[in-house]
Amino acid sequence: MKLAITLALVTLALLCSPASAGICPRFAHVIENLLLGTPSSYETSLKEFEPDDTMKDAGMQMKKVLDSLPQTTRENIMKLTEKIVKSPLCM
């Protein structure tokens, strides 16, 4: 659970950074697959970013932890992320 909260906070910090001109659609796709997709779809969404094996392994470990959460919890984390990103505080 701590990992999921950490991930959500890091994601929101990145997406709401004043330096960001907007949300990278590909990054949003990766996060969606991380939270709601299959391990295979998550791994596929990472390929274009060319992570090294250590990064891929870490991402897959995180995916396993997140997949252990109930589906509704993961859906609500995604909704929370979307709500915060669309907030006037992040624009």
Curated annotation (Swiss-Prot):
Inducing stimuli: By progesterone.
UniProt entry keywords in alphabetical sequence: Disulfide bond, Lipid-binding, Phospholipase A2 inhibitor, Secreted, Signal, Steroid-binding
Leader sequence segment: 1-21
Pfam short name (any one): Uteroglobin
Domain of life: Eukaryota
Entry's Gene Ontology cellular component terms: cytoplasm; extracellular space
CDD domains: Secretoglobin
Role, per record: Uteroglobin binds progesterone specifically and with high affinity. It may regulate progesterone concentrations reaching the blastocyst. It is also a potent inhibitor of phospholipase A2.
Family (UniProt): Belongs to the secretoglobin family.
Subunit structure as annotated in this protein's UniProt entry: Antiparallel homodimer; disulfide-linked. Interaction with LMBR1L is controversial.
Name of this protein: Uteroglobin
Organism classification: Eukaryota, Metazoa, Chordata, Craniata, Vertebrata
